[in-house]
Design a protein with these regions (language model features):
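S-adenosylmethionine
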Residues: 1-322
């Protein structure tokens, strides 16, 4: 097997913690607002998060994912609180606080829980410490305090808006209703649910059954999914996953684990394989191709990605997996 490359949540609360010193919430809110502005401008969340300071990234990633799941509701609330759309950095910070505020009360996805007044205080502090938002700090404070006073009435006022109800873009909701008239609500509801942490066993090193026995011996609850996958009952940091550092398993969504076997199923494995993975980072499917093809055929995989930073992850993952 050969490979050539070219450039190209544990829970949110635990992800937000630091091993050394507590990071003020206002700093995380600032960084989350910067990421949200980038996403609204067309960047992927992954690309935007790569620009976040390393010490802040785990907590900010948790906040970003949490906020995006509630962004439709937050934007609807902001429209009730402000007659005009504020400048992007201000709007991002306000919507983030609203998303965390209303979801804090519901707690419908096991997410973050902040005291509402602490959240307002830290959002205003974040605004004051950024020159781009400092002039609007009083505006943010007024909007958020009004939300606290009128929360029930405001939530009721936006309850009939599809984007507020489902936290998806309107075009997406309309398309799902058209394509899946009987199940569109179930699909949207599932999209708003935290995905379980899925692992893929490296069949060059361990079988699914063997790894499940390892987890059972360590009192880690898990269940098999598909031919190579394992769903953990509770997410955990990768360094705490047995065998992760030794390359026995990778973190990979169960759906993504279907790509490599589906491709190989349609190829003649009696012949040498030359495979192009044109969107390879961080290398999960590339590694899976090599793991499976290596047991059946000679495979040369060329892995490409447009992002040089993420392309480095391909090398790191392949080195770890061996």
């Amino acid at each position: 097997m050969t490979l050539s490359t070219s450039s190209s949540p544990a829970s949110a609360a635990s992800a937000a913690s630091s091993a050394f010193a507590p990071i003020p919430l206002w700093r995380q809110l600032q960084a989350t607002a910067t990421v949200l502005v980038a996403i609204r401008a067309g960047q992927s969340a992954t690309t935007a998060l790569n620009g976040v300071e390393t010490s802040l990234r785990p907590g900010v990633q948790a906040l970003v994912f949490h906020v995006l799941r509630g962004l439709g509701q937050a934007e609807a609330l902001r429209r009730k609180l402000a007659n005009r759309t504020p400048p992007p950095p201000v709007d991002a910070l306000l919507c983030i606080a609203l998303a965390l505020g209303w979801r804090e009360e519901r707690g419908d996805d096991g997410g973050l829980f902040y005291d509402p007044f602490t959240l307002v205080d830290q959002a205003v502090e974040a605004a004051k410490r950024n020159p781009a938002t400092r002039p609007q700090a009083s505006f943010i404070n007024a909007c958020l305090r009004r939300f606290l006073r009128e929360r029930d009435a405001l939530l009721e006022a936006v309850a009939g808006e599809p984007m507020a109800t489902w936290n998806h873009p309107r075009w997406w909701i309309d398309r799902l209703r058209q394509d899946h008239p009987r199940r569109w609500r179930d699909i949207l509801q599932a999209n708003n649910t935290h995905a379980p942490m899925a692992l893929r066993v490296n069949v060059q090193k361990v079988s699914q059954a063997q790894y499940l026995r390892t987890l059972d011996a360590m009192n880690i609850e898990a269940m098999p999914v598909g031919a190579f996958g394992i769903l953990l009952d509770q997410a955990r940091p990768v360094q705490d996953i047995p065998g992760f550092l030794d390359g026995q398993v990778s973190v990979q969504d169960a759906g993504a684990q279907m790509a490599a076997p589906l491709l190989l199923r349609g190829l003649d494995l009696s012949q040498p394989l030359h495979i192009l993975d044109a969107c390879a980072a961080p290398g999960g499917k590339t590694a899976h191709l090599l793991e499976l093809a290596g047991a059946q055929a000679h495979a040369h995989v060329t892995a490409l990605d447009i992002d040089p930073v993420r392309c480095e992850r391909i090398h790191q993952n392949l080195d770890r997996l061996g």
